[in-house]
Amino acid sequence: MSRQHQKSSPPGGSTRSLRVGELIRHAVAEILAQGGVHDPVLESHLVTVPEVRMSPDLKLATIYVMPLGGRDEKLVIDALEHHKRFLRGEIAHRVNLKFAPELRFRIDERFAEAERIDKLLRSPAVQKDLEPNSDQD
C-alpha cells in the first residue's frame, strides 16, 4: 500500500494550529478588553494581543502581548503569569478544544524591531544612498 500524498502545511504551522491560535487570540483579547481579569496592573494598562502561536499538538499556546505605549512590560507579563490558571479556564469555556492548552506569555518584539528599522532607514547615511545621483544623467 502506498502512502497518500500529504498536503503541505502553510508557513507557521498547520491550518488547524493557525485557526486555533487565532481563536485563542480573540478570546484572550476579549477577556482583557472586558476587564475579566481583576488585577490592578492589567486594569491600568491596555494590552494588545497581536499573535498566538500553537504547538503542533495544540497543548501549548505562546501568547504574544504588548502593553500600549510599550511601558511596564515586565509588570504586565508577571500579572498575566499570575492569572494564567484563570485565563486557561476562560479560554477552555470560549474555545471548544479537547484539552485547554498550557499558556506562555511573551512580549511581542516586532514593534520595537519595526521602529529600529524605520529609524535606520531615516538615518543620514541611508538617506545619502537613496538620493538620486546627479552625475549619472
From Swiss-Prot:
Record's subunit section: Monomer. Binds 30S ribosomal subunits, but not 50S ribosomal subunits or 70S ribosomes.
Family label: Belongs to the RbfA family.
Gene Ontology process terms (BP): maturation of SSU-rRNA
InterPro entries (alphabetical): KH_dom-like_a/b, RbfA, RbfA_dom_sf, Ribosome-bd_factorA_CS
Functional summary from the UniProt entry: One of several proteins that assist in the late maturation steps of the functional core of the 30S ribosomal subunit. Associates with free 30S ribosomal subunits (but not with 30S subunits that are part of 70S ribosomes or polysomes). Required for efficient processing of 16S rRNA. May interact with the 5'-terminal helix region of 16S rRNA.
Subcellular location: Cytoplasm
Entry's Gene Ontology cellular component terms: cytosol
Gene3D superfamilies attached to this UniProt entry: 3.30.300.20
Predominant location: cytoplasm
Keywords, ordered alphabetically: Cytoplasm, Ribosome biogenesis
PANTHER family with a match to the protein in the record: RIBOSOME-BINDING FACTOR A, CHLOROPLASTIC-RELATED
GO MF terms held by the record: ribosomal small subunit binding
Any matching Pfam family: RBFA
Keyword Cytoplasm belongs to the record: yes
Name assigned to this protein: Ribosome-binding factor A
